[in-house]
């Protein structure tokens, strides 16, 4: 059983966070939380999303699992105006999701969850460096790095106590250093890893410029990015595997 | 003889209503009205437009007929700012239309009216159901239906006293029901017809979201859509032939 | 030695004025002025730009010459917000330009000036007609002319004391006449020349609609267009060679 009412903004934010990595996903409909875990086809980027029942206008669920086509669901949500409410109701028998927006009813055929790529186990890493940074600074770094290279190094300099971004191209380079007073928080630790810019650009699309983003970093380790959605009633974690550094 | 001054907005609205169906048209320049009738190449959609002399800043005509390339005339009108006035003057000898916008003069070669597809006779049908609906509700229905199908059913349910829209796709469906309190007016009568979404999408482009649109519907009959333009100094009627239903 | 701080707006305006004609250019870094002269590959359009040291927040230079890729430098400047300051510093040894925007450092490899097309000598012509006109009127004339033709005639009618623009297409024509009261200034003299619209469209892109543009015109002679940038701390001159008229 699943029946919920949610604002168009919240639904769009939720779907966008996942659709930057995958086209289809499984959605867990537990009694107090809607949750999604997914990994991209190359197993390089992962997403773990939780949206509390309190993020909804109303929410009733009892532990179901549905498979959805994300871009289709995004298109439907995109028909609603910003403040409008969207009603969702699962028909268990037909395995269809009834979506209502101000009298307009869309009947969406669901996907068999077994046909969707398996959900990843997102490892509980104990990474030495923690950085809290504004979404707009991630956007600036990723946009600039993309002008010169297809990969980007993120690290923490424990000596000078700063977070840095480096991108080295064939002729041009991009470098950004942020000291503690330019960050929301810095818990320095030895960290330097290289990442594919394609993935970070996709993740960056889903990060609001005003969001406070927590980064967890290590030395040639995956990076984790955490941020809130839906007025902190929802939470997204991205994990991105490092690229092997050639020196 | 034809000489007129009209606001850029009014001219654009007029041209757009016709250009969604045809590339070229004949314009009748009668002494108190400018009028256009046209049918698309497949004879599926028709338009009948009247613009009263009172919609113009000034208007002098004596029953002439000109043939124009609509997209060309739209491009010219598009050079004017929203509030600007456009002067039109026909040179009978050269068969050219002189168009002036704030000192800029564009000389447009006209098309021989005889070379343009014949104007349709728009039949005076006595259709059983009449619905008055906001332009934005037509827009919502057409946009949603377009996500699942290439045709759309419009009808009136006399039992439940409501207007409905149905679009059935291979996997997903769209359904919209509007009761009298969600409509401007409903004069129920037996009606259900299937239409090509391509045509309705084109017509929808020319219908302002704030317009009050009168629909006339029947059972496997053409639909007529009426709405005002130019502050009710002009009027547009679209007629769209039904598709044969396969059951 | 070169070290300067400049607003993003001023830098963008400067680069745009030159990039409409060429992809790479030499920049002269004199002690009180930054200047650029360039000619397009076909030697039809030329630009001569001066930006005074006073247009910068701070400026130190001693007569250097650098070669730059304009679109790359425009992309970098485009990362800054409208009001933001951009720091430029030349590393003489590595021949790289260090560009800083709010902590983000971009290291741009310069181009050997000797590998860039030679700078033109812009002739000091004594043209008989001078017209001062708003940028928006140039924009209107060029946009309209582009609808009918690929060349445009500009001239002054000394008899009627007006500046005119003519474009003749295969079927349609565009004509604009501006009398002294519709111009900022008119110093009439015999002038009529035909120009390639492609070049004038490119130059028009860099002319602000609110700019006061000085035109110098002659009879089958090049045209010169002058306008200020950077709150009159900078100045741009375009020169465009005429096309041969076929009569």
UniProtKB/Swiss-Prot annotation, chains A, B, C:
InterPro entries hit by this protein: DNA_clamp_sf, Pr_cel_nuc_antig, Pr_cel_nuc_antig_C, Pr_cel_nuc_antig_CS, Pr_cel_nuc_antig_N
Record's subunit section: Homotrimer. The subunits circularize to form a toroid; DNA passes through its center. Replication factor C (RFC) is required to load the toroid on the DNA.
Keywords, ordered alphabetically: DNA replication, DNA-binding
Family listed: Belongs to the PCNA family.
Matches recorded under Pfam families: PCNA_C, PCNA_N
GO MF, any single term: DNA polymerase processivity factor activity
GO BP: any one term: leading strand elongation
Domain of life, source organism: Archaea
Name of the protein in question: DNA polymerase sliding clamp
Underlying gene: pcn
Described function: Sliding clamp subunit that acts as a moving platform for DNA processing. Responsible for tethering the catalytic subunit of DNA polymerase and other proteins to DNA during high-speed replication.
Organismal lineage: Archaea, Methanobacteriati, Methanobacteriota, Stenosarchaea group, Halobacteria
């Amino acid at each position: 059983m699943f029946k919920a009412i949610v604002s168009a903004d919240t639904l769009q934010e939720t779907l966008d966070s996942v659709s930057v990595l995958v086209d289809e996903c499984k959605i867990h409909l537990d009694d107090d939380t809607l949750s999604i875990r997914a990994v991209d086809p190359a197993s390089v980027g992962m997403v773990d999303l939780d949206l509390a029942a309190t993020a909804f206008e109303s929410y009733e669920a009892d532990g179901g699992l549905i498979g959805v086509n994300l871009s289709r669901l995004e298109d439907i949500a995109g028909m609603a105006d910003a403040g409008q409410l969207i009603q969702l109701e699962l028909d268990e028998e037909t395995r269809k999701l009834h979506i209502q927006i101000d009298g307009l009813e869309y009947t969406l055929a669901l996907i068999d969850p077994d046909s969707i790529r398996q959900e990843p186990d997102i490892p509980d890493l104990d990474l030495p460096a923690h950085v809290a940074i504004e979404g707009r600074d991630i956007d600036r770094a990723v946009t600039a790095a993309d002008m010169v290279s297809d990969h980007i190094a993120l690290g923490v300099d424990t000596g000078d106590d700063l977070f840095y971004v480096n991108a080295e191209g064939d002729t041009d380079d991009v470098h950004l250093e942020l000291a503690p007073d330019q960050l929301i928080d810095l818990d320095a630790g030895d960290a330097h890893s290289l990442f594919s810019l394609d993935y970070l650009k996709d993740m960056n699309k889903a990060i609001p410029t005003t969001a406070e983003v927590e980064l967890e970093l290590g030395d040639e380790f995956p990076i984790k990015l955490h941020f809130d959605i839906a007025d902190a009633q929802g939470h997204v974690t991205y994990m991105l595997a490092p690229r092997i550094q050639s020196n």
